[in-house]
């Protein structure tokens, strides 16, 4: 059976072709034709995916996930497998959008199955002037995550982000150019941390090349980019430092620039970064290794910033995650990524279908995507008594990191539900449970001794105790318990209300309500 293999060289070579754009059969992107039936390459191979394969979840039922660099992202359900996917729509109105779609398809397809640190790509199709890209659905972004994140957990999140950046820089020779909390996604059940939104990424022909275009989100841009100078991989390192700082402190690093007009705030930021002082003032009580890590990333001179490989050896990462520094220096596998069969999304998702006979109603043919599908059932809490599935190429340290992240998110979600049920305010939640959760995670992750020795199985007793305590607290509050069903160790989700992303978002500090990034981008572009 023939397989679709996207010719990345042909895409890059034909990128400036005059034939790109709308045609009778769809939208031509380099050597690819994106039609209503899916993606066809120049050899005639077709990766099948169409609107009729999907049902878009209504916005009133949590269907709207957010906006990318130039398109909206909605939740959809693949009717053949009942699996939830993220469906990104990019309205094609010019060459800029053609370029973005090319970058998305190239990066997602090349990274799919080659690394677990980028969101998976399922397929694409064209419909009524837009290109829709189906990707792996995640639970949320770091923008929505409870903040501040305790250092032991933050180190695990940061290490997983670094693994994704290492793949982009070393294997794909790509600068992401828009790394920010909303472009780093998490899965609360598995602890996966994945980089997304490659619409403004830039390819470097060799490791010494640099770029010069001005795209991305202004408040996470490095000084050399703000000045319009040439830049390289160090620009992503700067953005990473700001993301880590935001997770550590709980607010956008340059939130204080919200006063005045958009133009005044932009020039204030540029003046600050061009000054002689440090780029970022960190709280004196911050963990010393964490502060040193952030400071190393946000050095104003790009030549003095460390690489991803060097940061993976930083004391902040090694201390809390226990990952062997020499192991991180090994290059990623350069094997050819798995390619999709002609069945496309349908064949890929049906292999992992959670249940048979759960197909959804047919999507309507023609017209705009109909938001008529019922919202997918809430995902039950993470069951840490079962070891997390190992991704291809993962080490024990990777699994340990994901376990710590998943457990922390799960603990915060449970406390949020409990406080919400008791009628406590958001401020009370921020004052009390974080310290307890942080202490618990720090102990279990082996603060000072590394988290590499932490396995999912080793968390069984503690997790079971947490669920027993949580159920007891719910009973005291007049909520139903587990009904005395299966033992906790065998089913630690029994009797516990299903937790959804909304439970976690309720506790989110988030970025400032005034979106400085959007205002500055409107000013500049």
From Swiss-Prot:
GO molecular function annotation: ATP binding; MAP kinase kinase activity; metal ion binding; protein serine kinase activity; protein serine/threonine kinase activator activity; protein serine/threonine kinase activity; protein tyrosine kinase activity
Catalytic residues, chain numbering: 178
One GO BP: MAPK cascade
Chain ranges of the Protein kinase domain: 59-317
Domain of life: Eukaryota
CDD domains: PKc_MAPKK_plant_like
Key words, A-Z: ATP-binding, Kinase, Magnesium, Metal-binding, Nucleotide-binding, Serine/threonine-protein kinase, Transferase, Tyrosine-protein kinase
Cofactor: Mg(2+)
Any coiled-coil regions, as ranges: none
Catalysed reactions, semicolon-separated: L-tyrosyl-[protein] + ATP = O-phospho-L-tyrosyl-[protein] + ADP + H(+); L-seryl-[protein] + ATP = O-phospho-L-seryl-[protein] + ADP + H(+); L-threonyl-[protein] + ATP = O-phospho-L-threonyl-[protein] + ADP + H(+)
Binding residue positions for ATP: 65-73, 88
Cofactor comment text: Mn(2+) was used in the in vitro kinase assay but Mg(2+) is likely to be the in vivo cofactor.
SMART domains: S_TKc
Compositionally biased residues, Low complexity: 358-367
Recorded family membership: Belongs to the protein kinase superfamily. STE Ser/Thr protein kinase family. MAP kinase kinase subfamily.
Function according to Swiss-Prot or TrEMBL: Protein kinase which phosphorylates and activates MPK4 in vitro.
Protein's name according to its UniProt entry: Mitogen-activated protein kinase kinase 5
């Amino acid at each position: 059976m023939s397989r679709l293999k996207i010719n990345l060289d042909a895409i890059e070579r034909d990128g400036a072709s005059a034939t790109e754009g709308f045609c009778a059969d769809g939208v031509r992107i380099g050597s690819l034709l994106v039609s209503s039936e899916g993606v066809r390459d120049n050899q005639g191979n077709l990766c099948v995916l169409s609107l009729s394969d999907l049902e878009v979840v209504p916005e009133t039922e949590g269907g709207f996930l957010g906006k990318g660099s130039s398109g909206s992202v909605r939740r959809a359900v693949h009717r053949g497998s009942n699996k939830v996917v993220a469906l990104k729509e990019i309205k094609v109105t010019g060459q800029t959008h053609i370029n973005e779609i090319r970058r998305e398809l190239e990066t997602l397809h090349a990274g799919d199955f080659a690394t677990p640190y980028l969101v998976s790509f399922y397929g694409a199709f064209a419909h009524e002037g837009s290109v829709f890209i189906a990707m792996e659905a995640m639970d949320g972004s770091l923008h929505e995550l409870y903040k501040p994140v305790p250092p032991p957990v933050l180190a695990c999140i940061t290490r997983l982000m670094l693994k994704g950046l290492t793949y982009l820089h070393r294997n794909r020779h790509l600068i992401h150019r828009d790394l920010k909390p909303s472009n780093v996604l998490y899965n609360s059940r598995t602890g996966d941390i994945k980089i997304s939104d490659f619409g403004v990424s830039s390819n470097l022909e060799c490791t010494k090349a640099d770029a010069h275009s001005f795209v991305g989100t202004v408040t996470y841009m490095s000084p050399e980019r703000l000045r319009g100078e040439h830049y390289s991989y160090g620009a992503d390192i700067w953005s990473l430092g700001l993301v880590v700082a935001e997770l550590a402190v709980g607010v956008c690093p340059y939130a204080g620039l919200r006063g005045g007009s958009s133009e005044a705030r932009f020039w204030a930021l540029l003046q600050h970064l061009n000054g002689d002082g440090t780029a970022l003032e960190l709280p004196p009580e911050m963990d010393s290794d964490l502060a040193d890590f952030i400071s190393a990333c946000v050095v104003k001179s790009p030549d003095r910033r460390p690489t991803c490989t060097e940061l993976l050896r930083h004391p902040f990462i090694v201390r809390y995650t226990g990952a062997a520094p020499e192991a991180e220096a090994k290059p990623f596998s350069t094997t050819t990524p798995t390619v999709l069969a002609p069945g496309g999304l349908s064949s890929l998702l049906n292999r992992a279908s959670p249940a048979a006979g759960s197909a959804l109603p047919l999507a309507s043919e023609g017209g705009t995507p109909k938001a008529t599908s019922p919202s997918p059932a809430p995902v039950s809490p993470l069951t840490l008594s079962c070891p997390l599935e190992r991704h291809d190429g993962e080490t024990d340290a990777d699994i340990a990191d994901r376990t710590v992240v998943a457990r922390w998110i799960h603990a915060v979600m449970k406390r949020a539900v409990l406080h919400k049920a008791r009628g406590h305010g958001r401020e009370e939640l921020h004052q009390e449970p974080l310290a307890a959760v942080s202490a618990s995670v720090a102990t279990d992750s082996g603060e000072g001794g590394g988290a590499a020795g932490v396995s999912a199985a080793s968390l069984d007793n503690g997790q079971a105790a947490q669920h027993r305590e949580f159920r007891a607290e719910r009973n005291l509050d007049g909520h139903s318990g587990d009904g005395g069903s299966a033992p906790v160790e065998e089913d630690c989700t029994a009797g516990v209300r299903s937790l959804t992303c909304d439970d976690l978002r309720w506790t989110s500090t988030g970025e400032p309500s005034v979106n400085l990034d959007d205002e500055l981008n409107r000013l500049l572009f």
